Amino acid sequence: MREIVHIQAGQCGNQIGTKFWEVISDEHGIDPAGGYVGDSALQLERINVYYNESSSQKYVPRAALVDLEPGTMDSVRSGPFGQLFRPDNFIFGQTGAGNNWAKGHYTEGAELVDSVLDVVRKECEHCDCLQGFQLTHSLGGGTGSGMGTLLISKIREEYPDRIMNTFSVMPSPKVSDTVVEPYNATLSVHQLVENTDETYCIDNEALYDICFRTLKLTTPTYGDLNHLVSATMSGVTTSLRFPGQLNADLRKLAVNMVPFPRLHFFMPGFAPLTARGSQQYRALTVPELTQQMFDAKNMMAACDPRHGRYLTVAAVFRGPMSMKEVDEQMLAIQNKNSSYFVEWIPNNVKVAVCDIPPRGLKMSATFIGNSTAIQELFKRISEQFSAMFRRKAFLHWFTGEGMDEMEFTEAESNMNDLVSEYQQYQDATADEGEEAFEDDEEEVNE
């Protein structure tokens, strides 16, 4: 089977990663000890994508858990699914990265990276046919951002033809942990643009707004935010984990979603978003799901898709529903909002349907959009970056670890280039767009 190796780095990465494993273990009928307690053959049909089967019929996540301090690992280990993971696959330092990208990327992280790569290598050797890697991390801290991007580039060197997929939590002013977040994020995006094939941008600000406005939680905790992230991650990986037709592996998804190699930052969304207590009181219909799924309020990145245009969209519907109805609703949305889809990529909306709904819901829909509006997120980080960098504020923490100011300047201009590339395709009309598309193809053919 087409296996995926999962890596989670840093505090945020480990928290959302562990939640992801809890959710998908539940969906596949795997109990906290790794035993199978499910009731459907579908649960096991593609179980090998994320789990190794041990000789004693135990299912073990194909996961490496990485952090530069022991704290998060301890809480994962003592959590409900702590015994599910292979003990050898916990790799941690003692010092911590102190929210410093340079420590994660160049000093502390660089010392630990080889032992992580050993674990990754071992997991890859157990694979029949490895399709790629997925990393969960945040871009605001030190370990997930600095060491996470270091791991990506090392894995890229060793497995250049495998897909690299990340779930990256972007910093936001509303939920700020550290003052140097804009530095860490800009340096990370600089790496992600070059080294990943698909990046799901998850944004704390958007998650907060969803908890606050839609779920009516007055004081959302990180637990509530992670609950949303895990629902979304479970949704976007559905077609990888259950037998289905469309986007059934990472490469097919990338082919459908990425028209230009640098523009691979996706905006995820999820429906239905109902407060945790009131799920059973809602009867859901396909039109409602479709409507909600495209709603700006349901996006997990704090960008308004109405301020941009969709290059491509993939949607995953889950639950017993009529394929025909789903297709009709999706067409209706495209026709009604045609100005929000670029006209120079025909058929740019793809739909997959999986019969198995997530736990506690009759049906759900997950949205993956490659929208030019994602530039708002990068602009926001860039403005904060420039404000501090102009004054060289806090730079000594980074230069002290051996970094050069030049690197900051490069990262900044790379991110600004990314913003203008998104803008260019947002403004492109059919005639210009097609030319751009052809130019791009010519380069590929050479």
Swiss-Prot record:
GO terms for molecular function: GTP binding; GTPase activity; metal ion binding; structural constituent of cytoskeleton. CDD domains: beta_tubulin. Its cofactor is Mg(2+). GO terms for biological process: microtubule cytoskeleton organization; mitotic cell cycle. GTP binds at residues 11, 69, 138, 142-144, 204, 226. Mg(2+) binds at residue 69. Keywords: Cytoplasm, Cytoskeleton, GTP-binding, Isopeptide bond, Magnesium, Metal-binding, Microtubule, Nucleotide-binding, Phosphoprotein. It is found in: Cytoplasm, Cytoskeleton. A motif (MREI motif) lies at residues 1-4. It comes from the Eukaryota. One of its GO terms (cellular component) is microtubule. Pfam families: Tubulin, Tubulin_C. InterPro entries: Beta-tubulin_BS, Beta_tubulin, Tub_FtsZ_C, Tubulin, Tubulin/FtsZ-like_C, Tubulin/FtsZ_2-layer-sand-dom, Tubulin/FtsZ_GTPase_sf, Tubulin_C. SUPFAM superfamilies: Tubulin C-terminal domain-like, Tubulin nucleotide-binding domain-like. The modification Phosphoserine is found at residue 172. Tubulin is the major constituent of microtubules, a cylinder consisting of laterally associated linear protofilaments composed of alpha- and beta-tubulin heterodimers. Microtubules grow by the addition of GTP-tubulin dimers to the microtubule end, where a stabilizing cap forms. Below the cap, tubulin dimers are in GDP-bound state, owing to GTPase activity of alpha-tubulin. PANTHER family: TUBULIN (PTHR11588). The highly acidic C-terminal region may bind cations such as calcium. Dimer of alpha and beta chains. A typical microtubule is a hollow water-filled tube with an outer diameter of 25 nm and an inner diameter of 15 nM. Alpha-beta heterodimers associate head-to-tail to form protofilaments running lengthwise along the microtubule wall with the beta-tubulin subunit facing the microtubule plus end conferring a structural polarity. Microtubules usually have 13 protofilaments but different protofilament numbers can be found in some organisms and specialized cells. Belongs to the tubulin family. This is Tubulin beta-6 chain. The gene is TUBB6.
